[in-house]
């Protein structure tokens, strides 16, 4: 079945629900005491995992659209990417405010230098910031070919973000490894899609 614009509208509504309902759940859990004895860590990990899930969903769009021959799916990619950035920003804020505290926010630079996993995290967020700021059609027209080069940096985030997660957890858990494997598979899939173009270019 060929997807129509109406289907894409419903998909975008589903994305909005999938991205906002977890935030509602988190707020309710905070207010109803549904978190652990270390709620700050719970919030940091929850927001970080949401950002990573949305990153993986964003990366999945292109190969899914190509293999299913549904080019309209690409219209969902920007929305997923913006929600990935939004949750990534919540993740950064949760660390800055809940872990360091507003009175010690100046220590953030020191923490970034002395904790390499934080360095990877802030690099990932800065790339997502650049991608979010240039996600409009206007920016795409103004930047021309440079726009695609910039947005290819999402694959750098796909490498750094799972490493950041693996490095940051203090207890043994399968989830960081699962996310890392999923990111690696998506990167491999993207490589296979780009390889024919590269060979054609070399010829």
Swiss-Prot record:
It is found in: Cell inner membrane. Its cofactor is FMN; heme b. The keyword Iron applies. One of its GO terms (biological process) is protein repair. One of its GO terms (molecular function) is electron transfer activity. Its main location: membrane. InterPro entries: Fe3_Rdtase_TM_dom, MsrQ-like. Binds 1 FMN per subunit. Binds 1 heme b (iron(II)-protoporphyrin IX) group per subunit. The chain crosses the membrane at residues 13-33, 79-99, 116-136, 147-167, 169-189. PANTHER family: PROTEIN-METHIONINE-SULFOXIDE REDUCTASE HEME-BINDING SUBUNIT MSRQ. HAMAP family: MsrQ. Part of the MsrPQ system that repairs oxidized periplasmic proteins containing methionine sulfoxide residues (Met-O), using respiratory chain electrons. Thus protects these proteins from oxidative-stress damage caused by reactive species of oxygen and chlorine generated by the host defense mechanisms. MsrPQ is essential for the maintenance of envelope integrity under bleach stress, rescuing a wide series of structurally unrelated periplasmic proteins from methionine oxidation. Heterodimer of a catalytic subunit (MsrP) and a heme-binding subunit (MsrQ). NCBIfam families: PRK05419.1-4. This is Protein-methionine-sulfoxide reductase heme-binding subunit MsrQ. It comes from Yersinia pseudotuberculosis serotype O:1b (strain IP 31758).
